[in-house]
Regions:
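Structural signature of the two symmetry-related core transmembrane helices
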Residues: 81-96, 301-316
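Helix-to-loop junctions at the C-terminal end of transmembrane segments
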Residues: 64-78, 285-299
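Helix-loop junctions at membrane interfaces in 12-TM secondary transporters
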Residues: 98-111, 318-330
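C-terminal membrane-cytosol helix-exit motif in multi-pass small-molecule transporters
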Residues: 157-170, 188-208
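Glycine-rich segments within core transmembrane alpha-helices of 12-TM secondary carriers
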Residues: 143-165
Length: 353
């Protein structure tokens, strides 16, 4: 039922579920582990390039497929089914990182690309289900609730994973490397378990009659061609998407590459992990507060403010030389990052035809 507490919470818990991947894998352990365990080169610049290439390949593939699979989902009323498919693609690939042995960077980056595709593609359909659980006046609050739960949920599991890494023997684990590999398994389990509420309690409204997958593909392709032919009629949407593609790619780059960047300039793993935990636990309340801020000055003005603030902080990040600088940046990043993500999702849901 739309606007029911149960459906809104069930939808929001998917953020809690998949943010474990964003935190423990994408932002936390994978960049460091890839550089120090899987990579076979002593050249830190080259390992950073491999990691950036993996992120770029995943992003390009998702960007290329998104309009087509989105159109198929619209015509076949299959957003939820496609969300589940891509979520479990990501879950299986994340769990697969457990089997990758030291030095096998090619297999590690392959699993990472597949998991990232599952994560990002799943989010396309997760975002598209927002109107199924909330009306327009509740978009900002519901979207912000999802991201805030994502930060606290991802942060909690990451904290457990960090403790496993720092004190492996306390958990019955032989060493830190095994602890990190087990962390990837824990992310897969966390992602799967906390996806269950959405699977059970979020009902996708039936917009079109159910059709076969082949009919959905045909109708989806026709819809995509039709939309592209009328692109000039959707100037607001196109303008927003172009801007969003640019600024959110910057946000995603910071999330994915910050730890690798800090490691490359000589910061200790413990300092980088501490900074990442700071982001998670500061962003949890900050995202909710930013939602209230948006109601005061308007969603677009709040989004402009967040983007400008985030940009200035990122510029300062280029001049970081001490570890305490990294902590300061982490706190300020946390103040704006969740707001950018949540309000962008809410605004896009409002303006799509």
């Amino acid at each position: 039922m739309i606007n029911s507490k149960k459906s809104i919470l069930a939808w929001s818990l998917y953020d809690w579920a998949n943010s474990a991947f964003a935190t423990t894998v994408m932002a936390g352990f994978f960049p460091v582990f890839f550089k120090e365990y899987w990579s076979t080169t002593d050249n830190v610049t080259l390992s950073t390039w491999y990691l950036g290439l993996g992120n770029s390949i995943a992003s390009i593939l998702v960007a290329a497929l998104a309009p087509f699979i989105g159109a198929i989902a619209d015509r076949g009323t299959a957003k939820k089914k496609l969300l589940i498919f891509f979520a479990f693609l990501g879950i299986i690939a994340t769990g697969g990182l457990w089997i990758v042995n030291q030095g096998h960077w090619q297999m590690a980056i392959l699993f990472y690309i597949i998991a990232s595709i599952g994560f990002m593609s799943g989010n396309i359909f997760y975002d598209a289900l927002l109107p199924a659980v909330a009306t327009k006046e509740k978009y900002d609050h519901t979207s912000s609730l999802g991201y805030s739960l994502g930060y606290i949920g991802g942060g909690l599991l990451f904290l457990i994973n960090v403790l496993m890494y720092l004190q492996p023997h306390s958990f019955g684990i032989p060493d830190g490397a095994t602890a990190i590999r087990l962390s990837f398994l824990s992310v897969a389990a966390w992602w799967a378990i906390f996806s269950i509420p959405l699977i059970l309690f979020v009902k996708e409204p039936k917009v079109h009659d159910s059709v076969s997958i082949f009919s959905s593909i045909k109708a989806g392709w026709s819809q995509l061609v039709s939309t592209l032919s009328k692109i000039r009629e959707y100037k607001v949407v196109v303008t927003f998407l172009m801007a969003y593609w640019l600024y959110i790619d910057g946000v995603d780059t910071i999330i994915r590459m910050a730890v690798d960047y800090g490691s490359s300039i000589g910061f200790s793993a413990s300092s980088l992990i501490t900074a990442l935990l700071l982001v998670q636990f500061v962003a949890f309340p900050a995202t909710l507060v930013y939602s209230r801020f948006a109601t005061k000055i308007g969603i677009k003005n709040a989004l402009y403010t967040a983007i400008i603030g985030y940009t200035l902080i990122t510029i300062f990040g280029a001049f970081v030389s001490k570890e305490w600088h990294f902590y300061v940046i982490a706190v300020f990043i946390a103040c704006f990052q969740g707001g950018i993500q949540a309000l962008s999702r809410s605004l896009y849901t409002r303006i799509i035809p």
